């Protein structure tokens, strides 16, 4: 039955977790031996423990039912606590992961990600020529605000591409490293980057080919009293710093903002275009850009997407992790419910006479329900008290991987415990 379910569910598993896993993996001798050993071990534990109890009680006592009324079954209760503890741990992890991903998805990254369409220049035309034609084609469109380009793309593009360039140089006798970004005119304005000192690049200003704009992290690394009076020397060429922009997240959010330097180098390969559009009609603006691209490059697929989609693609690993832990939570909950349901049937059978007497003396259905559920709820509470510190420590350690992260609060773990209690009560009620 398990193998049959695996065959049926495998395509969904591959889609859900974006994996090429197949049942052929099980033909590996090591895995096959491990699988057979696991089945035998589970069978031995599942059947061996009841057999051990029966051998201790003796045949006559077992037939009389003394096995069923064996007082407090510590092993049974311990296993239930373990099951619900794992479920609460996984539910807590899923909630924390979800909150962290939502935080990263909605975080202000320091640039306009909602009104900017980005796409690669992957056609036959020269980059500069393609940019010029795009500007000419889109200049009369009311939905288009500005067009610029750069040699790198923000986030992960629709084509799956992500590039970055890092260079090092000497500044006053010490090494300095910076990310290098070559941009076209209007880059700062198109992305709504915030200039905190100096100015942006100016169109048709020849001297700006030897000018740079740096971010705050780069300014801090250079440690100059008057940063706008400083220069960067590369390959015997000196570049004047004409502006400082506020730090923005040009890398994934599991990394601190690194030093960044913007260059306006002429005739450089600018492989990515950014088009800022109005917020009134995003869909029409996207269609206008796509039509313009198809006009100048009719034989090349348009691979444009809004920057917020590019940023969303950088969160794939986290979303896959949510799916995996969430699936584990569901599985743990199902197993806990099965065990709890079996236990409730067993308890009812054991206390049948007691329940009958209570009904005769006038006990209500709700009173009997409370009587039967309070012991189970105690197990869930114990599981919560044991699992919560572990979940808190584990998730706090995981969050340390992110410079930009949520703050853990008790409500997340209370919600996980509440879900476990609700599931337990619904299972018993059934």
Tell what function each PLM region has.
Residues 31-50, 88, 331, 337, ...:
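Hydrophobic alpha-helical transmembrane segments of polytopic membrane proteins
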Residues 7-37, 67-78, 268, 279, ...:
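Membrane-helix entry/capping segments
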Residues 99-119, 158-159, 189, 194, ...:
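Membrane-proximal juxtamembrane linkers immediately C-terminal to transmembrane helices
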Residues 1, 56-67, 338-379:
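Intracellular coupling helices
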Residues 1, 7-128, 399:
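Alpha-helical transmembrane segments of integral membrane proteins
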Residues 133-317:
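Mid-to-C-terminal secondary-structure elements
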Residues 1, 75-100, 319-353, 381-382, ...:
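Hydrophobic alpha-helical transmembrane segments of multi-pass inner-membrane transport and secretion
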Residues 1-10, 14, 91, 331, ...:
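Hydrophobic alpha-helical transmembrane segments that constitute the membrane-spanning cores
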């Amino acid at each position: 039955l398990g193998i049959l379910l695996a065959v049926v569910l495998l395509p969904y598993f591959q889609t859900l977790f974006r994996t090429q896993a197949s049942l052929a993996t099980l033909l590996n001798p090591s895995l096959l031996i491990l699988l057979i050993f696991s089945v035998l071990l589970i069978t031995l534990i599942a059947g061996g423990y009841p057999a051990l109890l029966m051998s201790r009680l003796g045949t006559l006592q077992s037939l009389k039912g003394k096995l069923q009324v064996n007082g407090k079954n510590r092993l049974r209760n311990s296993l239930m606590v373990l099951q619900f503890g794992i479920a609460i741990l996984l539910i807590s992890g899923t909630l924390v992961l979800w909150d962290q991903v939502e935080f990263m998805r909605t975080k202000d990254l320091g640039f306009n990600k909602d009104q900017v369409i980005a796409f690669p220049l992957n056609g036959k035309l020269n980059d500069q020529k393609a940019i010029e034609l795009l500007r000419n084609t889109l200049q009369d469109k009311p939905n288009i605000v500005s067009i610029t380009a750069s040699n790198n793309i923000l986030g992960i593009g629709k084509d799956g591409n992500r590039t970055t360039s890092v260079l090092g140089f000497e500044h006053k006798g010490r090494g300095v490293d910076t990310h290098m970004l070559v941009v076209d005119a209007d880059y700062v304005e198109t992305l709504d980057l915030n200039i905190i000192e100096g100015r942006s690049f100016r169109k048709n200003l020849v001297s700006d080919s030897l000018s740079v704009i740096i971010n705050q992290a780069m300014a801090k690394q250079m440690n100059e009293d008057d940063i706008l009076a400083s220069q960067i020397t590369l390959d015997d060429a000196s570049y004047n710093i004409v502006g400082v922009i506020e730090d923005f997240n040009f890398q994934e959010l599991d990394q601190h903002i690194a030093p960044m330097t913007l260059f306006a180098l002429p005739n450089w390969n600018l492989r990515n275009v950014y088009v800022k559009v109005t917020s009134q009609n995003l869909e029409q603006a996207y269609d206008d850009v796509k039509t313009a691209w198809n006009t100048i490059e009719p034989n090349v697929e348009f691979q444009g997407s809004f920057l917020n989609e590019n940023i969303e693609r950088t969160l794939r690993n986290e979303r896959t992790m949510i799916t995996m832990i969430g699936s584990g939570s569901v599985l743990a909950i199902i197993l806990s419910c099965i065990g709890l349901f079996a236990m409730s049937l067993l308890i009812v059978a054991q206390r049948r006479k007691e329940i009958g007497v209570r009904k005769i003396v006038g006990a209500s259905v709700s009173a009997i329900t409370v009587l039967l559920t309070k012991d189970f709820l105690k197990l869930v509470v114990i599981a919560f008290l044991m699992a919560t510190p572990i979940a808190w420590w584990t998730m706090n350690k995981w969050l340390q991987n992110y410079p930009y992260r949520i703050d853990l609060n008790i409500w997340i773990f209370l919600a996980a415990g509440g879900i476990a209690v609700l599931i337990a009560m619904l299972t018993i009620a059934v």
